[in-house]
Amino acid sequence: MTLAAPARHALTVRPVRLADAQSLQDFVQALDPASRRMRFHGAINGCPPALLRRLTEADGVRHVAFVALDSAPQCPAIAGEARYVANAEGDAAEFAICVSEAYRGSGVADELMRQLLNAARAAGIGWLYGDVLAENMRMAGFMRRQGFALAWPFDAEAGIERWERAVRERPQHRKRGFGRWLGMWLNREPVAAR
């Protein structure tokens, strides 16, 4: 899968490989301190070896991870990364996603989430959930747009909220009344009356 990057280069989204260790380390180290804190829920310096192992050792079954790559020489090799880790029962998985500052707002996160949802659906996982710092308004907006709902303030003391959604496709609801009219006007497509 390729998509347009900010500098009009093609990005490729693929599963993480062990050979991505150096690129993932560079990606994490290039994040500003606030972005690292939002992604890892705490201050980290660089990319410690234990973290690097967790980022690269995805088995493709219980732990699935993707990277968005930019091959342009002046751009970072990894534009974003996303992953999920399934629970012991295999019916739900916690996910995480992070996009380099240079690629935010370019659709990279949307494509990474699409890949995660497709992989989870194929694995029979019913729910994805993510724990997000309450102050991370950008991520909260992204989660809403992706169909996630705030499940509960997970840890009010730490300021972490849990967002979740079903992995299945979003249901298409029948539009009625004003909502039906507005939907037709916005979509500019005729909607058959039922």
Question: Across the structure, where does each feature detected by a protein language model lie?
Answer:
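Long, contiguous binding/interaction regions
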Residues: 1-194
